[in-house]
From Swiss-Prot:
It comes from the Bacteria. It comes from Proteus mirabilis (strain HI4320). This is UPF0208 membrane protein PMI1770. Coiled coil: none annotated. Belongs to the UPF0208 family. The keyword Membrane applies. It is a multi-pass membrane protein.
Length: 151
């Protein structure tokens, strides 16, 4: 498990951390009732894909129809900021330490890896949601679904 050192990041580091979290989190329907990440990742991916073209379309449409430049630029900037807001939220969430209930579940999943004879890197710091994402991604690939019974 190659986990980066998670420190309280600045704005751009938080966006990069959010992008890593977006790519790491396993979007599984069993996790949807417990974690808001599935909905946030889906909305952020939608925003990354469709908001820049929508921003360009609204900008050119308002200018072509003789609208003012100020509102056109404001609308385009707002549309482009939506995916950044999602990445920022994901980055903030990724750096958040796990609450006690999830911390216990985190260590239970690690224990199931040990029982299965699968080696894991030792936990160096307080586990964060990014650590949980790495662990869950690996668990969905290498363990049976019994680790979800405690969710």
């Amino acid at each position: 498990m190659n986990e980066p050192t998670v420190t309280p990041p600045g704005f751009f580091k938080k966006l990069r951390l959010g992008n890593e979290y977006l790519k790491t989190w396993p979007v599984e329907k069993q996790l949807a009732p417990v974690f808001p990440e599935n909905r946030m990742i889906k909305a952020t991916r939608f925003g990354i894909r469709y908001m820049p073209p929508i921003a360009i379309f609204t900008l050119t449409w308002q200018i072509a129809l003789g609208g003012d430049l100020g509102p056109a630029i404001t609308t385009a900037l707002f549309a482009c900021s939506l995916p950044m807001q999602g990445l920022w939220w994901l980055g903030k969430r990724a750096a958040t330490p796990l609450p006690a209930v999830l911390l216990n579940w985190f260590y239970e999943i690690r224990e199931k890896f040990e029982q299965a004879g699968i080696a894991l890197a030792p936990v160096e710091k307080t586990p964060t949601y990014l650590s949980l994402a790495h662990l869950l991604k690996r668990a969905f690939k290498q363990l049976d679904r019994s680790f979800l019974d405690d969710v």
